A protein has these predicted regions:
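Non-catalytic all-alpha helical scaffold/repeat segments
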Residues: 1-160
Length: 160
């Protein structure tokens, strides 16, 4: 209940709690990942979103594990939020923002390709807003891959 109030509240007291949660989004995401190993917890998150459909899905999206265990698809929770709330612009915007929150070393191309693979799976999504978001994001990722490929080639040529 306390976290729900912090994530959903609109009063000044809840803004401080939200700020604290946002200060360490990486740790928050890791906490949610560990909590969501139990399928009943997943159902509770979805129920909470159903109880507060105008605010909860967007509040929780930045803290969800993005990918399944194999890393080749979006997580079940992300897909469920898109299925139920994918017409909410803020949900889609926050999913896009979450794509840039993981860390990497070396060439970033593999990371973009992983994201592109997951986003491409949304091209036939039942919600039009999700399909539009996926097309736009897919185009952006392809451009980033192209740009980074050129950068990697230039960097490689410098060190020959």
């Amino acid at each position: 209940p306390v976290v729900s109030i912090a994530l959903l509240g609109e009063e000044e007291e809840t803004n401080q709690a939200r700020s604290l949660l946002r200060l360490d989004m990486f740790r928050s995401r890791k906490i949610f990942e560990s909590l969501l190993q139990d399928p009943s917890r997943e159902a509770k998150v979805l129920k909470w979103c159903d109880e507060y459909p105008d605010r909860a899905p967007a509040s929780i999206m930045p803290m969800l594990p993005l990918y399944n265990e194999e890393g080749d698809r979006f997580s079940v929770l992300v897909m469920e939020l898109l299925r139920h709330y994918g017409d909410q612009e803020e949900v889609l915007s926050l999913l896009g923002s979450s794509l840039g929150t993981d860390s990497w070393s070396g060439s970033i191309i593999a990371r973009y390709e992983k994201q592109l693979s997951c986003v491409s799976q949304l091209m036939d999504h039942p919600r039009e807003a999700v399909r539009v978001w996926a097309r736009r994001t897919q185009s952006s990722l392809k451009e980033k891959i192209k740009r980074e490929t050129n950068t990697d080639q230039e960097r490689s040529a410098l060190y020959r």
